Amino acid sequence: MKNKKVLFFILLCVGAFVQAQETVRPFEEFFVEGMKKIDGVFPVYVADGEVYLEIPSEYIGREMQISAQIDRGFDLLCRPANGLGVVRITSPIEGTVCFQQPFYMERILDTESVYQQAFSLSNVQPEGISHSVVSYSGERGAIIRITEYLLNGDEWFSYQYSFIRSLVPALSEVVRIHPFDEGVSFTVKRYHGVEAERYMYSSSAIVLPDGSMPLEVTCVLRLLPQKKDRIRLADNRIPYRTLHFKDYSQDPYCMVAVSYTHLTLP
């Protein structure tokens, strides 16, 4: 029975691998005439309203922060949005890139511990948000389609206000792409349904005939620096914070409860 389960798992993985391979196009076919490339830490490709992000091969295994804010719209100005946060970029199989958020309640602090391999096998983390690779660049960078995540999705970022109604997907558009030293940002104009009566006397709001208003949102992808025993805080200006987890590298017979207090000065 156990052998049958193992065989089924292998066949499932092989099927996923073959399916991923079939969807990957040669770069010459992907980079069509009229496509625009924006260089940077994460190169971006734009063509016919579609947006693609390249993940260089050397960044697989690195961590990235996905954050967002509402720039303007609905009488809101520079309001923070709920971002996905810190993710680890992984590629569990060829043709797939995942944004993983590992569960850190158990760790091995000693990176050279003999238990590292056994721990990684027994403490398998969920893959997270999966993205199919559409092509590989000449430098073997994985290129993924991110149009839906920016224009209509709520997996990367979201916001909730009682006066912001449902999204009108057909009107969404990317209005600005800005590469910077640590990553890239996307400014997106989304249109949402609105209560027209709420903005009858607002001088800053223009309600469209179909009952929708624009909302500008900026989503930022930032590559985080490599750091031994990475413990990421939401804001590095926080003077202290205590984290609790269990370490398996201090005692070969049992786990040890650890409390870390971040005392870095702002």
State each model region's role.
Residues 1-7:
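Bacterial N-terminal signal peptides that target proteins for export
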Residues 11-19:
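Hydrophobic h-region of N-terminal signal peptides that target proteins for export
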Residues 22-263:
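Auxiliary tRNA-acceptor-end handling modules of aminoacyl-tRNA synthetases
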